[in-house]
Amino acid sequence: MILLYIQNRWIISFLFIVSSLLVVLGLTIYKNEKTVDLSDVEINHLKLNETFDNSEYSLNKHVKLDRYVFYNHNKYKNLTIKVKKKHHKIKGIILVKDTVVNTNFDVHIGDQIDAVIDNLGYNYDKDKVGKGYDALVYLDKDHHMKLSILYKDNIVKRIEFFSR
């Protein structure tokens, strides 16, 4: 009986040490993740988590989700806004093809990818996306935002900006 008690104590001690090391490792990885303040980023004068004014937008009936509704700009058809139904807050902005839509970080569709890095900095993760596209992904852990700049042949093709 005493031998069984000693073995259990060693097993419990070992499990405690392993779980402690895993927690420390996880916290270290989380702390060292790159983060950028994206709270001031605007696309077509729209910010995430602001109340949405749909006066210049038409409802996109092709995309249907339970908690969200999507709008397309009347003038810029490739500018799509994802809006939370309950609070009517902007939760996503997607821009494709329209080269004239403004961003406050001075990047447009068709610009060189170097312009993105010059204006937003080097705290990004590089990612491969389907059909030969690459992406620069900027994360804002404090505000729970993610800005993805998709590019092909060093030319910006798509801008996606989402919030939780």
Specify the residue positions occupied by each region the protein language model found.
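N-terminal Lys/Arg-rich, disordered targeting/topogenic segments
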Residues: M1-R9
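Hydrophobic membrane-insertion alpha-helices, especially the h-region
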Residues: W10-T28
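N-proximal short alpha-helices
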Residues: T28, K89-I90
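A cross-family detector of function-defining hotspots
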Residues: T35-D40, K47-K89, T99, H108-R164
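N-terminal glycine/threonine-rich, aromatic-flanked beta-hairpin/loop signature
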Residues: I94-V96
